[in-house]
């Protein structure tokens, strides 16, 4: 678990404002392989809860609320380290990913690549769960 000795929120620049919420960009990366799993936003509360619990929390810009990654699916991210960029407006969460990071069922949200004028599923993309079994048909 990540231990914080103080309020790291004052060290960061929550300068990305979406719908009145001050946010930082958060990149989740597999702590062993370096694979980029997902990109999301964090507000101050999401960062605080992440540091206190050792599990990734994010701010949903579409739902306008805090969410624990994996709260519906069980596919949580255990945070091993937090890196901060030079401007203090983005973090990389080095995580141990349980199951898939992407709501589409893939291990990573970055399962497609650009091929000419098309998006193609990468040959090495790994689908680890069926989203309909977890989320229903929506």
Curated annotation (Swiss-Prot):
Its EC number is 3.5.4.19. Pathway: Amino-acid biosynthesis; L-histidine biosynthesis; L-histidine from 5-phospho-alpha-D-ribose 1-diphosphate: step 3/9. GO terms for molecular function: magnesium ion binding; phosphoribosyl-AMP cyclohydrolase activity; zinc ion binding. The keyword Cytoplasm applies. InterPro entries: PRA-CH (IPR026660), PRib_AMP_CycHydrolase_dom (IPR002496), PRib_AMP_CycHydrolase_sf (IPR038019). It catalyses: 1-(5-phospho-beta-D-ribosyl)-5'-AMP + H2O = 1-(5-phospho-beta-D-ribosyl)-5-[(5-phospho-beta-D-ribosylamino)methylideneamino]imidazole-4-carboxamide. Mg(2+) binds at residues 85, 87, 89. Its main location: cytoplasm. Keywords: Amino-acid biosynthesis, Cytoplasm, Histidine biosynthesis, Hydrolase, Magnesium, Metal-binding, Zinc. The keyword Cytoplasm applies. One of its GO terms (cellular component) is cytoplasm. Disulfide bonds: none annotated. It is found in: Cytoplasm. Zn(2+) binds at residues 86, 102, 109. It is an enzyme of class 3 (hydrolase). Binds 1 Mg(2+) ion per subunit. Binds 1 zinc ion per subunit. Its cofactor is Mg(2+); Zn(2+). Homodimer. Belongs to the PRA-CH family. This is Phosphoribosyl-AMP cyclohydrolase. It comes from Methanothermobacter thermautotrophicus (strain ATCC 29096 / DSM 1053 / JCM 10044 / NBRC 100330 / Delta H) (Methanobacterium thermoautotrophicum). The lineage of its organism: Archaea, Methanobacteriati, Methanobacteriota, Methanomada group, Methanobacteria.
